[in-house]
């Protein structure tokens, strides 16, 4: 934690030229090698740090790799791995201000999980059975089940988005990224 605060102080000094007296940032290594990228913003509550865009993109790439449709593993194991990556990343960057970014990532992650579930159901009969089990009316389930393999369209624009809701995924074990961040960051 001290190292992260040290780097945030270093970032604020670099951006805002607020250097304390003495050589606080003396380091045997080159500063370019030890630079932690990020930004500091001032809002009504004071100075806030946020993770650099590269760090956010790396987090998204990790989640995308875990949500590949071609990786045929059990959904429980996949959710376990996603939760590990999510907890680790949020615990590392928890003092940062990133509520809106994490909300968007959370929505997209749930869409990717819906696509995976839709693909795992494979045939129309199984898809209809799954939708009926989730409480969708029979005629709607029959129509949506026969849409074909338009995974992203089905996961975002159909009844699947409401049937496989955030609550259903939470029961299955997936932690909400934005909820976990708010819990850990004490916002």
Segments (PLM) and residue ranges:
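Non-catalytic terminal/accessory segments
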Residues: 1-187
């Amino acid at each position: 934690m001290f190292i992260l605060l040290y780097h945030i102080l270093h970032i604020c000094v670099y951006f805002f030229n607020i250097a304390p007296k003495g050589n606080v940032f003396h380091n045997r290594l080159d500063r370019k090698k030890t630079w932690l990228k990020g930004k500091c913003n001032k809002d009504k509550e004071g100075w806030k740090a946020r993770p650099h865009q590269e760090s956010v993109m790396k987090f998204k790439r990790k989640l995308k790799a875990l949500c590949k449709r071609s990786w045929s593993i059990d959904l429980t194991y996949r959710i376990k791995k996603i939760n590990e990556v999510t907890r680790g990343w949020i615990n590392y960057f928890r003092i940062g201000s990133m509520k809106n970014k994490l909300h968007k990532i959370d929505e997209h992650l749930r869409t990717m999980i819906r696509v995976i579930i839709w693909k795992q159901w494979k045939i129309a009969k199984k898809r209809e059975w799954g939708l009926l089990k989730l409480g969708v009316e029979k005629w709607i389930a029959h129509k949506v089940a026969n849409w074909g393999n338009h995974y992203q369209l089905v996961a975002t624009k159909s009844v699947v988005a409401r049937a496989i809701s955030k609550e259903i995924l939470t029961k299955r074990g997936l932690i909400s990224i934005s909820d976990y961040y708010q819990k850990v960051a004490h916002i």
